[in-house]
Amino acid sequence: MLRKGTERAYSHVTFSGDGTQLASVGSAPDYMLTVWDWKSEKVILRAKAFSQDIFRVAFSPYVEGQLITSGTGHIRFWKMASTFTGLKLQGDIGKFGQLELSDVSGFAELPDGKVLCGTEYGTLLLWEGNLVKAQLVGEGEEDTPLHQGMIEVVLLEGGTAQAPEVVLTAGADGFIRTWDFFEIDNAESDETPNVVISLKKEQRVVASNGEPAYIVDLVKGNDHWLV
């Protein structure tokens, strides 16, 4: 049993890639990020993740000792860093720059260390370090969103872990959309942060009442997807 990770409730938990560690984030009032040796039921590291709600935590699939948290008006990039006083969690807050702050739910780390996240405005942000490298928008008028409303899911698919082929996104509008990974990974912005990307394909998911489904997660099975 894992105790004292947060005062009231956990908002999200996840395992490391090798399954040896567990990361949890708590809700109000403490908003704690805790990394556990879950088999030994011991806390390895803990730190206050943010001052508002945290939706998600994930270990880096590529670099040991790195994590990402996101939630209300923020995304934060963490390292388990060796200091003079021992191992500590150090977190860099993502700086939105000239872009409007956004809640962040879905995100994915790319093999080269950049991070791709969704926004509540239906765009994607490409991060390099804790700075926005580009805001990805759709074809059409300026600032055309890729989705209507919050993007809850950002996944890398196809190819291999080191060389994915596509990015899948989904969220509030009920659409699952597919984008070219190479086009996103190589996006470069000029005078404005916006970079237009092209839609490869899409699938609309409808709820039992006929309305668009609000998609909060996609889980891949052997021969199917669970939405």
Segments (PLM) and residue ranges:
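Tandem repeat protein-protein interaction scaffolds
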Residues: 1-37, 52
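Repetitive beta-architecture junctions, highlighting loop-to-beta-strand starts
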Residues: 31-33, 65, 73, 122, ...
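Short loop/turn segments immediately following beta-strands, especially the blade-tip
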Residues: 79-86, 130-134, 180-190
